Every structure is written in C-alpha cells, then in structure tokens.
C-alpha cells in the first residue's frame, strides 16, 4: 500500500500536535509543583500565633461591632421624629414629660390637645345639642391650650334617630358605641380616638341630640334618648377622610343594631350621595388649607 503526500502530511501534523500537547501538560505540572513549593515556603516563614492574629483579628472585630451599632442606632432613629413632632405640638409641656415611655408620649399630648377642641364643635352644632353650661365649663377647663387651637371652620354631622317611641336605651346604646371604639370623656360625651383603647387624637365625637346634650353614666341604666349625633370638626384629625369613614361606620352600626334612622345635618335622610358630598367637603377643605399654607 503506497502512502501519498497527503497521508504523510496528516501523520506529521498529528505527531506535531501530540508533541505540543505533551509539552504543555509537562510544563503545567511542573508549574504547579513550583507554586506549591513557594506557598509552603511563604507560610512556613510566618509566626504561628501572631501571624494568624494579625490576619483574622480585624475581621472579627468588625463583625462583632456591626450588630451592636445597627441595633443601637435603629432605636433612636425611630423615636426621634415622634419626639420632634411632640415638641412642635406642645412646647410648653416638653419639660414635664420626665421618663414616660415613647409610646405613651404622643397619646398624652394628643389627648390634651384634641379634646378641648370639642367645645368649638359643640358650639357650632345644631340647637338640639344645647349644652351651654357644659360648653362654658369646657372652655374654662381648657384654659390657654384651647386658644392655641385653630377655630373650627366646618362640622360634619350625622344623626341617628330612634324609630322606637322609647328611644335608645342606655345600656344597649353604651354597649353599641363601646364596640365601635368610642369612650366617655371630656364634656360628658363620647369620643373616638385613634386607638380603640381611647388613646391618641380625637377623630370624632358623639353627643346626645336631646337637651342638655350630655350622658350620665351614673344613671345609664335608666337613661334613654330619641337621638344621638356624631360630629367631626375641620380642622381636626390629621387624616379627616379616614376619620369620617370610621364615623360613618359607627353611625351605621348603631342604626342597624338599635333600629335607628340616619339623618344628615339638615335632618334629611342620609343617602350615599350625601355621604359622598361630605367627602367632597373634606377634599375641598384640605385643598383650601394647602393653598393657604403656600
């Protein structure tokens, strides 16, 4: 069998490629041995204890310091905005807070600031809310704090009138409004605060729609009334639209469970359209407030 030039060239190429691969493998193996030898020599020259302390020491110190720094810095960063807001609302009371817990500070301040606002709401309400003597005493108790509050410009009123001739009975009425989060307070009427427990700013209030407009808890078992009125003043809560929704829910619950009828501030039947009109009044008030600030 004769071998042509083409076959010889292919055979020579294969031999050359095999030689190149073998040479590369030999060099690579020799290089690994030298590198390992150099690393062994470099580590053998380092001190056993001091060298390891210098290499590992800094990383351990940094790791142990990170967690305490983050934990300690997070706590003041969360409470600082609340403290600054309290100082702006009640600068005269800043030095009397002492060692109150961070959660209790806004609740106490909001109670003192928001509750005196109710006399203004009551004074602007319907004649059915007549309680002149109680309003005057409320103003006297408020003192200088009431003077710092902005005047109430608008009052949103929802009345619940009993369909029964006997009216709303005291025990049933009390149980119903307590379930809605209202608590007995300033001016002998009920207030709904931010917290269901009765802490935080006042969102809205509920008064007796029959003179003298108050509730007597000592005689609540024998108490009855033909109507009650929920009212929300503007300016008032920080989030008036949400507060209004809570007020509507409380009024609807009372009307549904105690056989009452919802009325608006004109003593007309409260409809979905009327509720939407109330919401629009809130939006317009907020828009005017922003315009005045600018």
Swiss-Prot record:
Query: Record's InterPro entries?
Result: Cell_div_ZipA, ZipA_FtsZ-bd_C, ZipA_FtsZ-bd_C_sf
Task: Describe, as the record does, how this protein assembles with itself and its partners.
Answer: Interacts with FtsZ via their C-terminal domains.
Q: Which HAMAP family match?
A: ZipA
Role: Essential cell division protein that stabilizes the FtsZ protofilaments by cross-linking them and that serves as a cytoplasmic membrane anchor for the Z ring. Also required for the recruitment to the septal ring of downstream cell division proteins.
Q: Which stretches are Cytoplasmic in the membrane topology?
A: 23-294
* Protein's gene: zipA
Q: What keywords appear on the UniProt entry? A: Cell cycle, Cell division, Cell inner membrane, Cell membrane, Membrane, Transmembrane, Transmembrane helix
Question: What protein does this entry describe?
Answer: Cell division protein ZipA
Q: What family is this protein classified in?
A: Belongs to the ZipA family.
Quick one: where's region Disordered? 47-107
Please report the record's description of how this protein sits within the membrane: Single-pass type I membrane protein
**Transmembrane annotation, as ranges:** 2-22
